[in-house]
Structures are given as C-alpha cells and as structure tokens.
UniProtKB/Swiss-Prot annotation:
Reported function: Component of the velvet transcription factor complex that controls sexual/asexual developmental ratio in response to light, promoting sexual development in the darkness while stimulating asexual sporulation under illumination. The velvet complex hat acts as a global regulator for secondary metabolite gene expression. Controls the expression of the dothistromin gene cluster. Regulates hyphal growth and pigment formation. Acts as a positive regulator of virulence.
Keywords: Cytoplasm, Nucleus, Sporulation, Transcription, Transcription regulation
Region Disordered, annotated ranges: 1-57, 222-497, 511-611
Name of the molecule in the record: Developmental and secondary metabolism regulator veA
Cellular compartment(s): Nucleus; Cytoplasm
C-alpha cells in the first residue's frame, strides 16, 4: 500500500477551529481521531446486504476538546451546548469517472453515520464520538470525514452578528464548526477479507465506561497464505500481457507439427488411438439374438432335430456350458425375460433316423414308463413291429404346450459339455408333448422331417428321473409319448389317443354346473380317451337354458326366458332323472320360490322345512 498514491488532505487525524462570541470571548475547538479504521468487508447491495454486514474494524473514535481564551482553559464540560458528529465516506485514491457518471456520486456508506458526544474520564476527560456501526458496500481505498455540528443553549455563547450570518447561512438551529478526516483504510471483498481483529485497548476502555461497543476477546483473523510471487493484479497484468497477446494471435497454417493453444505451443500427443473394443462390450443389448453363424456353430456340436431351442420361463436363466456367444460378454439379467433365438433352417439340420424298436408286447403285460431318451424309460412300442410310427415335428405343437413341465434330455457324459442338472420330481405326463399331431399336418410336412422312435432302454433305468440340463438350449424337445391303444382299435391303423383323464375327483369337487364351453367338443386327444356318457345324467340343455348361447342379441337385448325356458324349473326335471330320488314321488324342494336375478338368471329357493 506504500506504492499507492493517496489524495493528500490537510485535516487528517487532527483539526482545530476558533470563533468569537457576542461578548468577545474566543472559543477553540480541537478534534482528533484517536482510533483509526483499518479494514472493512464490502457488504454489497440488495436485500441480503443489511442482514450480512461487517462493521469497520476497529470502530472509529473521535475526541473533542473545547478551550476558551488565550490561556486555553478547558471548558468541554462547562459548555452549555449539544454536539454531534456526522461521518461521510470519501475516496482515498483518485478514481477516473466513467462517461455519463455523476462526479458528485459518493460511495455508499451504510450503518449509523451520526454519533452524539459522550463525556468520558478515560483515557482523558473529554467528549468522545464513537461509530461502532459503519459499513461500506464496495471494495476499495477510502477515508472517513467527520463533521462537527453545535447547537448552543446560552445566547451569550453565540457568534457575533456578522460572523453568525456567514457561518449559519440562514435561520439554522445548528452550526457547523469544523471537520476532521481519518487515515485511509482498505475495504475487502467477501473472499479476500482477512477477518475481524481482537478488540483494542481503547475499545475495551470505552466499553467499560458504559458505551455500546462490541468487544471481541478472541482473534478471528483468517490465515491466508501469500501468493507465490507476492504480486498484485496490476503487476500480474503487466507480466502476462505478452503471453495473452501471443494466445490471441492467429495460428500459422504452415506449422504442422505443433498446435497453438491459449497456454502456448504444445506438441500433440504422438500416441495412436487404442484399437481395443473392450469398452464397447458392455454396450450390447442383454437380450440380443445370436446370429445365424453363431447358431450354426452351436448346432454342429450336438445332434439336433430342427427345432428352436427352448428358453426357460423361470427367473433363473441357463447358459451354454461353453460360455455365452461372442457378442455377449456378460451374463444376462436373471429377471429379464429372454427372447428365444432364431430357429435355424429345417432342411439344414435333419434329425437322425433311429432303428426300428424291438418286437412289441401286449398292453396288459407292458407297463407305461415315463417318457425319456437314451438312459431314461421310453414309451411302449406299437403293437406290430413291422410298422414304424412316424411323428411330425412341429414348432406349433412345441410352443403350444406348457413349457414349465418340460423335462430336458440328460445326455451321456461328454468332454467339456457335461454339467450338473437340476433334478425334478416325476410328475404326470406333460400336456405340451403328449398332444399328438393331426394327420393332416403330418401329410403336409416333407418326409425328411420324420424320425423313428428311439429303442426302449433297459428296465433297470425305469426309476430314474428326468432333469433339466443346460444342453437343453440347443437341443430339440423330447419325442411324444407312445399313445395308448384300445382293444377295439385295428392293428393296421395308427392311433394317436392317450389314456383318458380321470375327472371323477374333479367333478365331485365342483359346486356348480359346468359352463357350455366345458361340454363343447374337444380335439382328437380328448375325444378318443373319454369314457362313455352316463345316460342317467341330465344334459346341460335339460337343466339350463342355452337359448341365449345360439340366438343373437342385438341392440342391448338381454337373455330372455319364456315359461318353458327357465334356468331352473320343476317341470323340466322329472323324478326319474334325479339320481337322489329313489321313488317316483316329486321332490318338494322343486316347488320352492322362483325369482330372476339382475343378470337374467332364475334362482329357486326351497320351501321352508324342506331345505
């Protein structure tokens, strides 16, 4: 700060003035700035400036003494008048004003710029003016100017008439006596402010005598490391002028080996770009389908039957024993449903032909083992050994079944392809693979798509269970189970019927009548294996009205029932049709109350006492 030029003033720190009263007495006023301001933090402008202000530190303290005559008698305590000091802010350095800016605009000074005089005994008996609440809005170099104003109470202490007009400048109640200026001090920004210092001895002394001064007993200075060069912005700007001029120049197009940057000339990095694509492996889709080349490599390693591999529907996905495909380096998410891979062309992967099975045995002697391949019990052979049963391999029949019950193939141990499989307890025959193909579909397929039934395994392996294998992803589904032949079926005709489903337990547990869809005709699988219909049971049309099933309903019509078309009537049911009535007498429960529900159904309630 020594190199900076400040505006010189005559009344810095000390100032004095003398006047003559009406009775000819000479009164001298002397002011001295006992405590100079040293630093302040700029509080800025806006709503938050008043809430976060830092006062000028330390608080300025100005001392006033009044003397009378040439003997300089101290009349500070005996002078009958009121005194107050008004503080203003001035620039300590010359500032060039911008164009259009008013030269009379002063820096903004906030806080309490006015202080009244207090009489204190220490450090010396005198009048003191204390400014504990002064703040500056902008950073820079400033000085404070203090102006003393006097309000006289005794008429004899007033100035002479000719001097009073010049001093007051009109009819005024107060008179300006003198002015004193403080030493220059620096106002820092919030970032560079070093902090408030500990309260001075003078501030403590004034506070002990009852004046309102904030006392700080701890050091609150901020430790800031000096810059490496110790240079201010002005010197730094001069040193870096050449470098900034170089950076703003246009680069020379003839220079190829170097490039120009704001920080100078640097040599480009000669290292070539890496050719590794390891960082792109994680960008692939998790559920990407393998390409035809990948499918071909997988299909050449094991025998196939021209069908699409199966994707398990459970939450735990199975991967191939030799790792994921080349385009997928990370295992797929366990909770993302995988898309099934593309099905390879059927003519390219033809199923192998198996030899004819051994001579068959009768249905009564041969039990029906579970369906399997290789080391699992196979289905019973057909009645005639000379006839070869051919089954159609269809992706439609494969996809239409329930895949959760599908047992996979457990192949013999092979090098590099054997994995532990998850055992599944034996269950009933899965419906997805016991449903045979219709004859019309088999006639449309080429002969190369048929294969013979595998030979039956030894009886010792009949108790083994089917299991899930990881090879199931690239192998076809198991062959359909051998159909069961009835005794009245001709030997020369191939039957695709299976044993009938036992529905006795299902019917006994039902609490309501079957819907019309349950009694509708089904496919050949169910039609051939059903038991003969009991003639003593009533049909659906005898008990319930099926008129609204066939007749169309137009324009908001609802099912309407005539007198003879009621859902439950006592006249349509005869006593002979009811299995529960052994006698020919009419059941009283049929003569109960009849009413119709909102959905059109007719409800019957039995008579009291006959329920």
């Amino acid at each position: 700060m020594n190199r900076k030029t400040h505006i010189p003033v005559e009344n810095e720190t000390k100032s004095s003035a003398t006047r003559t009263t009406n009775d000819g007495r000479a009164i001298t006023y002397e002011m001295q700035v006992l405590q100079q301001p040293q630093r302040a933090r700029a509080c800025g402008q806006g709503a938050k400036s008043s809430a976060d202000r830092r006062p000028v530190d330390p608080p300025p303290i100005v001392e006033l003494k009044i003397f009378e005559g040439e003997k300089r008698d101290d009349i500070t305590y005996t002078m009958h008048a009121n005194y107050f000091l008004f503080a203003t802010l001035e620039q300590a350095r010359p500032i060039a004003h911008a164009r259009g800016q008013d030269r009379n605009t002063h820096p903004v000074l906030t806080g309490t710029p006015v202080a009244g005089m207090v009489y204190l005994d220490r450090p010396t008996p005198a009048g003191y003016f204390i400014f504990p609440d002064l703040s500056v809005r902008h950073e820079g170099e400033y000085r404070l100017s203090f102006s003393l104003y006097e309000e006289l109470k005794n008429p004899k202490d007033e100035d002479k008439p000719e001097e009073a007009c010049d001093a007051a400048g009109g009819d005024a109640h107060v008179t300006h006596r003198l002015e004193v200026k403080s030493a220059p001090f620096h106002v820092y920004s919030a970032k560079k402010f070093p902090g408030l210092t500990e309260s001075t001895h003078l501030s403590r002394m004034v506070a002990e005598q009852g004046c309102r001064v904030r006392i700080r007993r701890d050091v609150r200075m901020r430790r800031r490391e000096p810059k490496s060069g110790g240079k201010d912005w002005d010197e730094y700007e001069e040193d870096t002028a050449a470098a900034r001029a170089r950076a703003s120049a246009t680069p020379d197009p003839s220079i190829n080996g170097y490039m120009q940057t704001p920080h100078g000339f640097i040599e480009p990095n000669p290292r070539p770009r890496s050719a590794s694509n390891a960082s792109h492996q994680s960008l692939g889709s998790i559920s990407r389908r393998p390409s035809m080349q990948e499918m071909g490599q997988a299909y050449h390693q094991q025998p196939h039957y021209g069908t699409a591999p199966h994707t398990p529907q459970n939450g735990y996905t199975q991967t191939a024993p030799y790792g994921p495909p080349p385009g997928q380096q990370y295992p797929p998410n366990q909770f993302v449903q995988q898309q099934p891979p593309m099905q390879p062309p059927l003519p390219q992967y033809q199923p192998p032909n198996y030899p004819a099975p051994p001579p068959p045995v009768t249905a009564a002697q041969q039990p029906q083992p579970a369906q399997s391949y290789y080391n699992y019990p196979a289905a019973p052979p057909p009645p005639q050994a000379t006839q070869v049963q051919q089954y159609n391999v269809s992706a439609h029949a494969y996809d239409s079944g329930v895949q959760s019950h599908r047992p996979s193939i457990d192949f013999p141990a092979q090098d590099g392809y054997r994995r532990n499989s998850q055992q599944i307890p034996p269950t009933s025959q899965p419906t997805a693979y016991t449903q045979p193909m219709q004859p019309q579909y088999a006639a449309q397929m080429p002969p190369a798509q048929h294969y013979q039934q595998p030979p039956p395994p030894p009886p010792s392996q009949a108790s083994q269970h089917s299991s899930y294998s990881s090879m199931d992803l690239y192998n076809s589904r198991p062959a359909p189970i051998e159909p069961h032949h009835h005794g009245n079926t001709p030997a020369s005709k191939a039957s695709f019927d299976l044993p009938p489903i036992n529905t006795a337990a299902m019917v006994s547990n039902k609490l309501e009548a079957s819907s019309p869809t349950s009694v509708a005709p089904t496919n050949a699988y169910f039609s051939g294996g059903q038991t003969p219909i009991d003639t003593h049971k009533r049909s659906y049309g005898d008990v319930f009205s099926n008129r609204h099933h066939n007749a169309p309903l137009r324009q908001g019509q609802r099912p309407s029932y005539g007198q003879g078309d009621s859902l439950v009537t006592g006249t349509t049911m005869s006593a002979a049709d009811d299995d529960d009535n052994a006698s020919s007498e009419l059941d009283p429960s049929t003569l109960g109350m009849h009413y119709r529900r909102a959905d059109g159904r007719q409800i019957q309630r039995a008579l009291p006492g006959h329920a």
